[in-house]
Amino acid sequence: LRLIIESQVDAIIFDEKRLNLAKDVITSKDSNVKYFICMDYNEDSNGILSFSKLLKDGKKLIESNSSKYNSISIDKDKLSVLIYTSGTTNNPKAVMLSQYNICSNVSAMTTLIKYEKDDSILVFLPLHHTLACLASFLFCYYIGFRLCFADSIKDIGKNMVEYKISGLVCVPAVLEIMYRQIIRGVKKSGKYTAFKFLCAFSNFLMFFHIDIRRKLFKQVLDNFGGKMRTIIYGSAATDKKVIHLFNTIGIDMLQGYGL
């Protein structure tokens, strides 16, 4: 409630689970909110608007040749987004961003990431974090990737295989888990010595720009769905040996950061 009042927003969009919070905002004398939009309502009710009804009404306006939406003037440098920090050390602070901040980062990602039309990105980080929102949610919409939401953190591995994920945005803790799974699996198979040799051989070939990493480590990559090519990580320090291993087996690692 404090953040809604502090940010002086005109509208809030919420699901039915947050209905009590919305009612608190409605009764608050300090709130500037004019529009309350519920994702789960099919019809407007008690001053709360239905998201699906708004979409239908907007579609009707466009079909009737209304130009209200397309004629809206956008100032790309104007404050458009407030994203609050986690508040780990103190009260959450609002990070002020413009549309240009957001769009320029999403556009720049296309120059760094190799992508194919049938790629899928796995999402499990909170989308109110700038890195997760930019590198997964908005980037997927910009490029046309399929966006897959993980069932839970413990199901990430299963979801990678199920959805044949080609890209992942995560924190170092997830990388550590994946790293341990790889090492544990190789040792269990009794092929750890051969694996270390292939790692050295792969890096030797890469020195001469010969890239057959995905052929050498196909069995390992199959455990992550077989299509994983890129991982974007951030928010904390990552052990170099973890990054080095993923690069060695054919997964390109990119360090991201929130705006």
Regions found by a protein language model. Name each.
Residues 103-120, 127-218, 227, 252:
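Conserved AMP-binding/adenylation subdomain of ANL enzymes
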Residues 1-56:
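Structural core segment of the AMP-binding/adenylate-forming
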Residues 12, 79, 85-88, 121, ...:
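Conserved S/T- and glycine-rich ATP-binding loop of Class I adenylate-forming
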Residues 38, 59-84, 91, 114-120:
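Conserved pre-ATP/AMP-binding loop-to-beta segment of ANL
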Residues 51-52, 77, 100, 125:
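Structural detector for helix-capping/boundary residues
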Residues 1, 71, 157, 217-220:
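Short hydrophobic/charged patches on amphipathic alpha-helices used for structural packing
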Residues 173, 230, 234-242, 251-259:
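Conserved A3 ("GATE") glycine/threonine-rich loop of ANL adenylate-forming enzymes
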Residues 80-106:
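Conserved AMP-binding A3 loop
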